């Protein structure tokens, strides 16, 4: 029985170590506050204009989500944060060029928020077991701050998280995940 367990353990270890880690996508995070006398309704109306111009002019594949903190702490002293994604730094740069271009001037000048902090990150997108159609316009997202253990890499973290996701999917739990690191770590 020990030999069977050892063979099983070796095969499992080989699978974990041989799993390929995909290239990360690029993301920008902007923490924003509503301008005086502006509301979330104003922002949502503005986002329709943003979507129209992006749909007509974007060639970078940029997409964005807006998130609202559920709890307030000194670290979340903002009304919302904008998370924009592109598949590469080049395409994130193209999206930024588009934002500062003439097509976006009217939308840019009418934005009802002021962004007070920003950072760029890389994200490894893990396999989810649901489709966008399964989601409503509002759904919970949890962020967890983690430190790598000594001798471990972001690839190790990806493989570990990927294996945890597979276990939860087999148990019928619908979820998805991203491993996020500030650009200076990658």
Q: Each PLM stretch: what is its role?
A:
Residues 18-185:
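Short S/T/G/P-rich N-terminal loop/turn motif that feeds into the first structured element of a domain
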Residues 3-13:
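Sec-dependent N-terminal signal peptides
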